[in-house]
């Protein structure tokens, strides 16, 4: 099988849960983006690219549910995983807090353009979404946005930038992704992996 794992904060948890499920994978180096073990292949990619790799042919991947939702990729998600837990939230400067339902015409900075549009659409609110790749919390400070939608773990970064959470958009955790064709053509291997990880999760990963 071919696996694709996310660089960054989810890599350690991904390797740990696979090891506990019986897949002994060494941690890839920064320059070593592909490695092989027991006839399997492991790729290392940006978290936001993992669903794309899986949709287009890599058998199995792990990334955050926020990424899966934002990408909208056609992949099978058999399991939520017990790490990478945080939330995607709407936040804005504490001195100008406004209910989401009253934010018609507001500018929202985020790297989650699709999720943000869907969130406000569900409220019947029209906003301007400003797509940023990082340091989203700076946007209200410099006046290019009224609010942000971003990942929140402890809230420390928000507080440091004078922002407060207004609403939770979605809960986030790591997820196991499976290519839809591989799910059929490699059923036994995929099923064994899913069952092994389920046991790890049940025992407390």
Curated annotation (Swiss-Prot):
The protein's Enzyme Commission number: 2.4.2.17
Pfam families according to UniProt: HisG
Protein name (record): ATP phosphoribosyltransferase
InterPro entries: ATP_PRibTrfase_cat (IPR013820), ATP_PRibTrfase_CS (IPR018198), ATP_PRibTrfase_HisG (IPR001348), ATP_PRibTrfase_HisG_short (IPR024893)
Gene: hisG
Reactions the enzyme catalyzes: 1-(5-phospho-beta-D-ribosyl)-ATP + diphosphate = 5-phospho-alpha-D-ribose 1-diphosphate + ATP
Pathway participation: Amino-acid biosynthesis; L-histidine biosynthesis; L-histidine from 5-phospho-alpha-D-ribose 1-diphosphate: step 1/9
Top-level class of the enzyme under EC nomenclature: transferase
Family annotation (PANTHER family): ATP PHOSPHORIBOSYLTRANSFERASE, ATP PHOSPHORIBOSYLTRANSFERASE ATP-PRTASE
CDD domains the UniProt entry points to: PBP2_HisGs
Functional note: Catalyzes the condensation of ATP and 5-phosphoribose 1-diphosphate to form N'-(5'-phosphoribosyl)-ATP (PR-ATP). Has a crucial role in the pathway because the rate of histidine biosynthesis seems to be controlled primarily by regulation of HisG enzymatic activity.
Broad class of the protein's primary localization: cytoplasm
Any single GO CC term annotated in Swiss-Prot or TrEMBL for this entry: cytoplasm
Organism domain of life: Archaea
Source organism: Thermococcus gammatolerans (strain DSM 15229 / JCM 11827 / EJ3)
Keyword tags: Amino-acid biosynthesis, ATP-binding, Cytoplasm, Glycosyltransferase, Histidine biosynthesis, Nucleotide-binding, Transferase
UniProt GO BP: L-histidine biosynthetic process
Location(s) in or outside the cell: Cytoplasm
Family: Belongs to the ATP phosphoribosyltransferase family. Short subfamily.
MF GO annotations: ATP binding; ATP phosphoribosyltransferase activity
């Amino acid at each position: 099988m071919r696996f694709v794992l996310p660089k960054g904060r989810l890599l350690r948890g991904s390797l740990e849960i696979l090891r506990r499920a019986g897949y002994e994978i060494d941690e890839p180096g920064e320059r070593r983006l592909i490695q092989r073990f027991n006839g399997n292949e492991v790729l290392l990619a940006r978290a936001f690219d993992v669903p794309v790799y899986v949709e287009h042919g890599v058998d199995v991947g792990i990334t955050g549910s926020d990424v899966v939702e934002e990408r909208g990729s056609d992949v099978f998600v058999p399991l939520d995983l017990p790490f990478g837990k945080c939330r995607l939230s709407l936040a804005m400067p504490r001195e100008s807090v406004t209910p989401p339902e009253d934010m018609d015409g507001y500018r929202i900075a985020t790297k989650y353009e699709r999720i943000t549009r869907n969130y406000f659409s569900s409220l019947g609110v029209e906003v301007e979404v400003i797509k940023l790749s990082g340091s989203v919390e700076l946007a209200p400070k410099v006046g290019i946005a009224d609010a942000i939608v971003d990942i929140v773990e402890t809230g420390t970064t928000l507080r440091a930038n004078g922002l407060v959470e207004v609403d939770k958009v979605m809960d986030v955790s790591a997820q196991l992704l499976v290519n839809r064709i591989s799910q059929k053509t490699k059923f036994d291997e995929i099923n064994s992996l899913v069952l092994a990880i389920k046991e790890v999760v049940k025992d407390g990963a």
